[in-house]
Amino acid sequence: MVVIPHWHPSQNYGPRKKGGHPQLIVLHYTAMDTTEAALQRLCDPQHEVSAHYLISPKGIIWQMVDEAQRAWHAGAGCWGDIEDVNSQSIGIELANRGDHPFAEAQMVALEGLLRGVMARW
C-alpha cells in the first residue's frame, strides 16, 4: 500500500543539526479532543511544536514537515547516545486523547506510513 499524505505545512521546523538524519521514529498521541485541534496546534507558530505526520482515527494522514527537516516533537529528549532526538527522528502524532483505544483505521494507516518511512531512511 502506497501512502500519500495530505500536505498541511507547519512553520514549526528547522534544519537537522550536525548533519543528522532519521535513525528513530517517535510515536506520540496528541492528548487533544479532536484531530482538527491537534492539526491547528502543530501548525501554530506560537506553540513551537510540530511533527512530521498526524494520523486521524479515520486513517487520514497529514504531513506537516518534510522528512528531511527537523520537526519539533521530542523536546530536549535523548535516546541512548542520541542527544538531539528531533534531529535524528521522524515524529508521528496519533490523534487520540489517551483515554481510549486507537482506531483500527488509524493503526492500518500507521503501519503503511511506517513501512514507507523505514524504506526511505
Residue ranges and their predicted role:
Residues 25-27, 90-93:
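Oligomerization/assembly interface segments of phage tail-like spikes and tubes
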Residues 1-83:
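N-terminal catalytic cores of peptidoglycan-degrading enzymes
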Residues 46-49, 86-91, 97-121:
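Long, well-ordered alpha-helical scaffolding segments within enzyme catalytic domains
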